[in-house]
Design a protein with these regions (language model features):
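Surface-exposed strand-loop-strand hairpins of Gram-negative outer-membrane beta-barrel proteins
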Residues: 19-36, 44, 48-50
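N-terminal helix-cap/turn-to-beta initiation motif at the start of protein domains
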Residues: 1-8
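Contiguous, well-ordered beta-strand patches that form the walls/edges
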Residues: 12-18, 42-150
Length: 151
């Protein structure tokens, strides 16, 4: 499989009422209950909806140079002049017109895409590997709790 290119949001994992993991499409996620948000607080609900919209608009970009970028849309209503100043000051980085943090590294191992999460630690006294296999058996790119498909 050719992994190079842009991957777009497909679905996000959440728990249903039976404590089972289910994946919600963008539309389902935007309409899903907000159990951890006071839904009587309009500002909190608006913040959560903005965050959800940002999440479903996120892309992953797998580049030929071994870099993997998580791309987020610019906040709505920010003037281009302000964006240009933030870029010039090094506050944000843009790739394909979207914001990104430092890239992660990726490599192919036995035909599979692996990426370095950058998360290091120990499990039962043994050092854990920060590299994870990206593509699941269904062909989705798994990044944390989110599934992406090749655009």
């Amino acid at each position: 499989m050719n992994y190079i290119g842009t991957w777009v949001f497909h679905s996000i994992a959440t728990m249903n009422d039976k404590d089972e993991i289910v994946f919600l499409s963008a539309e389902e996620y935007m309409k899903a209950p907000m159990p951890y948000v006071d839904e009587t607080d309009e500002e909190a609900v608006a913040d959560e909806l903005r965050e959800r919209k940002r999440m479903v608009s996120t892309h992953l970009k797998v580049c030929t140079d071994g870099k993997l970028y998580m791309l987020s849309p610019l906040p709505e209503g920010v003037p281009q002049e302000e964006v240009d100043k933030a870029v010039a000051a090094g506050i944000i980085t843009l790739v394909d017109g979207m914001m990104t943090d430092r890239p992660l590294m990726w490599e192919e191992r036995d035909g599979d895409l692996w990426y370095d999460t950058g998360i290091e630690g120990e499990l039962f006294g043994e050092k854990t590997d920060s590299w994870v296999k990206a593509i699941d058996d269904e062909g989705f790119f798994i990044f944390a709790t989110t599934r992406f498909v090749k655009a």
